[in-house]
UniProtKB/Swiss-Prot annotation:
Belongs to the FrsA family. It is an enzyme of class 3 (hydrolase). Its EC number is 3.1.1.1. Keywords: Hydrolase, Serine esterase. It catalyses: a carboxylic ester + H2O = an alcohol + a carboxylate + H(+). InterPro entries: AB_hydrolase_fold, FrsA, FrsA-like, FrsA_esterase. The keyword Calcium does not apply. This is Esterase FrsA. The gene is frsA. PANTHER family: DIENELACTONE HYDROLASE DOMAIN-CONTAINING PROTEIN-RELATED, ESTERASE FRSA. Catalyzes the hydrolysis of esters. GO terms for molecular function: carboxylesterase activity.
Amino acid sequence: MTQANLSETLFKPRFKHPETSTLVRRFNHGAQPPVQSALDGKTIPHWYRMINRLMWIWRGIDPREILDVQARIVMSDAERTDDDLYDTVIGYRGGNWIYEWATQAMVWQQKACAEEDPQLSGRHWLHAATLYNIAAYPHLKGDDLAEQAQALSNRAYEEAAQRLPGTMRQMEFTVPGGAPITGFLHMPKGDGPFPTVLMCGGLDAMQTDYYSLYERYFAPRGIVMLTIDMPSVGFSSKWKLTQDSSLLHQHVLKALPNVPWVDHTRVAAFGFRFGANVAVRLAYLESPRLKAVACLGPVVHTLLSDFKCQQQVPEMYLDVLASRLGMHDASDEALRVELNRYSLKVQGLLGRRCPTPMLSGYWKNDPFSPEEDSRLITSSSADGKLLEIPFNPVYRNFDKGLQEITGWIEKRLC
């Protein structure tokens, strides 16, 4: 089946698909606070989703392309769930968030198919994969159209991997008590086994969102990057996120001695946002298997336990948390009680001495991850490093911060 036919088949209208903003029905909806964050983007009036321009541009999307798609959504006069929110158009049609971003992805998919140069074709496939992921954002459970966009993203990513430099292998990992999970092993040129970083991504991202991290920061250092999806999304969708948030990553770590391209004696974990919750748990529970753990904007305690902090978080992000926890109909109070159990301090881990070297990078006044969380991580480690990342200029400082973090990881692996 051709890619074009696959797209038509997946998105063929069969019934009235639920609109993304209606999937989580929390009862205590409050006023939307203005939020700006380097890793999560910012709230913009009249949009349900946070607009994450920095990360989308970092992943290779042109700023003008972002504005063009947003303009098509804004200009639509189709029926919306909420007339005040542009990105709530009902049904897979013009103006719907998933439709417009997937349509943009198909443009690049067609370019990729027409391009004779393998590397350029690979770039186009990667671009399409990124756009399909934006279409599926924020990846709420039960969002049928988003799940179809994710399937197209994974197909495009696999096509890109066949053409881009280095080698990428799709790996299947067995997890006792449930379905196996799929990860991607990104390898630089050369002979292995290689030092390896296990990527622990945020709750509103897919494992295929981190190719830029591998290409710009790990591959030049001769380091492999292994990704898996967080519980409840993508290839890990059959697994619910629980207080044992690191369960899937632990089983992957234990399987690494059987992966011939990986030097299982030189492994680090790198966590973005809630992925840092996973990475820090690994630092405590699997310290013999890890040389280092790095975190960026970690969600390990305050956001999970502090009501005032939770009040500053946008509606969409609370919906993501509720969706991952399987609490689609919960009140904010019930969600708060459950989130508190995910705090690594409440679990009795953070605050105890940890032998694993840990670095934590943070931005001042980050609504999702205050400085105190990063200090808690680094002060708990026998070899901790605290890294403040200035906010402006945001893109340059983000790049500089990642260079410093990956350099720190390299010293502990190589």
